[in-house]
Amino acid sequence: MPDEPRGELVIQTIAMPMDTNPNGDIFGGWVTSQMDLGSGILAAKTAKSRVVTVAMEGMSFLQPVRVGDTVRCYARIDRIGRTSMTIPVEVWVTRYMTGEELRVTHGVFTFVAVDENGRPVPVKRDGK
């Protein structure tokens, strides 16, 4: 496991009580949503267009996220195809009260650049 986050900080928030599952930990769907939002920001910035999520792969939940944890999503571009981008995402937390930093989740998201009608378009590279 890496000792520090890889990629660009794309989201930072605090895990709140309303986002818990029946066991009192933060619901995995909420964490996945943060990952999707953060990687979507990076994808749109890279493509310079609207993007849509087409796949999530290799999701691993390594540690629970707890209420009060500061949650940070880091993303990086792994691959750019003609219309798609593959973006690995890592979620790190700073534990509430102790300050311990841990990688808690990781996965890979794939986005496709689309036009205003939702049709795939080439990813614009260097403003082209």
Task: Report residues per predicted region.
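Hot-dog-fold acyl-thioester-processing enzymes
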Residues: 2-55, 112-128
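HotDog/MaoC-like acyl-thioester-processing domains
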Residues: 3-11, 66-67, 78-128
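Short non-domain terminal segments
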Residues: 25, 59, 107-109
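Short, charge-patterned binding micro-sites
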Residues: 56-64
